[in-house]
Swiss-Prot record:
Enzyme Commission code: 2.6.1.2
Organism expressing this protein natively: Escherichia coli (strain K12)
Principal subcellular localization: cytoplasm
Places the protein is found: Cytoplasm
Protein name: Glutamate-pyruvate aminotransferase AlaA
Lineage, opening ranks: Bacteria, Pseudomonadati, Pseudomonadota, Gammaproteobacteria, Enterobacterales
N6-(pyridoxal phosphate)lysine, modified sites: 240
Role played: Involved in the biosynthesis of alanine. Catalyzes the transamination of pyruvate by glutamate, leading to the formation of L-alanine and 2-oxoglutarate. Is also able to catalyze the reverse reaction.
Cofactor(s) needed: pyridoxal 5'-phosphate
Enzyme class: transferase
Length: 405
């Protein structure tokens, strides 16, 4: 019998956050080992519970949420999203401009599939959240990575963006606040990106899932209100700010001129209809989440868990010889730099795997985020301080004797 192979469409699709290193971690756990996980931004396992009022409203609406809804989502949920963004400067957004999906991930894939033809290019940051690159590849497009500059607080390199635009470039992806670096972009930088998009007729895809997870004096500026004359698609959801990643509730909001994008919008509506609708019971969480008390503020200010965990992780990382890190101003991650020459690192996945096998701590290698060099890794700052201290003390011990062959 001939082997059954995966589709050739998946040849360039990669999502190493849940890749071979995670499989090895699962094997270790099955053998009875405890693995400290600093690899994925899933708040619930780290003791971040959802607000009670969200759970109560979902439970209360369960009896009437057993059937399909509109393929774009419940009217009440989309109305709440519309009002949320109108109050933030997107005055012309209507209910029909909003699509609710099974998490932002599903919507990213739909947005790329509806737009890209074979060989079309999409500007994606390096490092990136790798689903963006995977979605572009799955949609027959080509992800062209523009560099973010570590020496400038991980802001995008505007000259590199300009240099990588070609006649095939359809759009640009902006992840702000950024995963994996924790950068929060200034209004001035965003205005410059808008001008580049304007000059080259690019669609802006704005991934803003961490827009309320900000530290110190950081301020988030949504890019869509800065570009009312451009088609901008903003992605957000409940997973991070409201700690309900398992609910799989995300949305995308179309803003700007849409008459010239009728064909693209038809494609989005077709893909939304093909999967019928997003999870209906969990959509009842959206109105409550956006309209109620924003409890995330308790975690991101001094004394709050996210604030204190970020600070402690940053201090400990920078105390490790050969490792340095830009202090994140938002999101749930850090993207430290490791002195590859000092440790002779030429394969960062091997480094992460070696660390896992020796110390039973799970990280993600930097190249998993489409960073071109094997000199970074990502950690999440969700674990409690005790676990962060234990994990990073193990990493310091590991590196003290590490040298790749």
């Amino acid at each position: 019998m001939s082997p059954i192979e995966k589709s050739s469409k998946l040849e360039n699709v990669c999502y190493d956050i849940r890749g071979p290193v995670l499989k090895e971690a699962k094997r270790l756990e099955e053998e009875g080992n405890k693995v400290l996980k600093l690899n994925i931004g899933n708040p619930a396992p780290f003791g971040f519970d959802a607000p009670d009022e969200i759970l109560v409203d979902v439970i209360r609406n369960l009896p009437t949420a057993q059937g399909y809804c509109d393929s774009k989502g419940l009217y009440s949920a989309r109305k709440a999203i519309m009002q949320h963004y109108q109050a933030r400067g997107m005055r012309d957004v209507t209910v029909e401009d909003i699509y609710i999906g099974n998490g932002v991930s599903e919507l990213i894939v739909q947005a790329m599939q509806a737009l890209l033809n074979s060989g079309d290019e999409m500007l994606v940051p390096a490092p990136d959240y790798p689903l963006w690159t995977a979605a572009v590849s799955l949609s027959s497009g080509k992800a062209v990575h523009y560099l973010c500059d570590e020496s400038s607080d991980w802001f995008p390199d505007l000259d590199d963006i300009r240099a990588k635009i070609t006649p095939r470039t359809r759009g640009i992806v902006i992840i702000n606040p950024n995963n994996p670096t924790g950068a929060v972009y200034s209004k001035e930088l965003l205005m410059e990106i808008v001008e580049i998009a304007r000059q080259h007729n690019l669609i802006i895809f704005a991934d803003e899932i961490y827009d309320k997870i900000l530290y110190d004096d950081a301020e988030h500026h949504s890019i869509a209100p800065l570009a009312p004359d451009l088609l901008t698609i903003t992605f957000n959801g409940l997973s991070k700010t409201y700690r309900v990643a398992g609910f799989r509730q995300g949305w995308m909001v179309l803003n700007g001129p849409k008459k010239h994008a009728k064909g693209y919008i038809e494609g989005l509506e077709m893909l939304a209809s093909m999967r019928l609708c997003a999870n209906v019971p969990a959509q009842h969480a959206i109105q409550t989440a956006l309209g109620g008390y924003q409890s995330i503020s308790e975690f991101i200010t001094p004394g709050g868990r996210l604030y204190e965990q970020r600070n402690r992780a940053w201090e400990l990382i920078n105390d490790i010889p050969g490792v340095s890190c830009v202090k994140p101003r938002g999101a749930l991650y850090m993207f430290p730099k490791i002195d590859a020459k000092r440790f002779n690192i030429h394969d960062d996945q091997k480094m992460v795997l070696d660390f896992l096998l020796q110390e039973k701590v799970l990280l993600v290698q930097g190249t998993a985020f489409n960073w071109p060099w094997p000199d970074h890794f990502r950690i999440v700052t969700l674990p409690r301080v005790d676990d962060i201290e234990l994990s990073l003390s193990k990493f310091a011990r590991f590196l003290s004797g590490y040298h790749q062959l």
